[in-house]
C-alpha cells in the first residue's frame, strides 16, 4: 500500500506525463 501512495504523489506531479 505504501508503494501505491508514493505512486499517487508522482502521478500528481506528472498528471498526464505517466498516463
From Swiss-Prot:
Family: Belongs to the scolopendra toxin 3 family.
TM stretches of this protein: none
Tissue: Expressed by the venom gland.
Protein name, UniProt field: Scolopendra 5848.46 Da toxin
Gene Ontology CC terms: extracellular region
Organism encoding this protein: Scolopendra angulata (Barbados giant red centipede)
Compartments where located: Secreted
UniProt keyword terms in alphabetical order: Neurotoxin, Secreted, Toxin
GO terms of molecular function: toxin activity
Top-level division of the source organism's lineage: Eukaryota
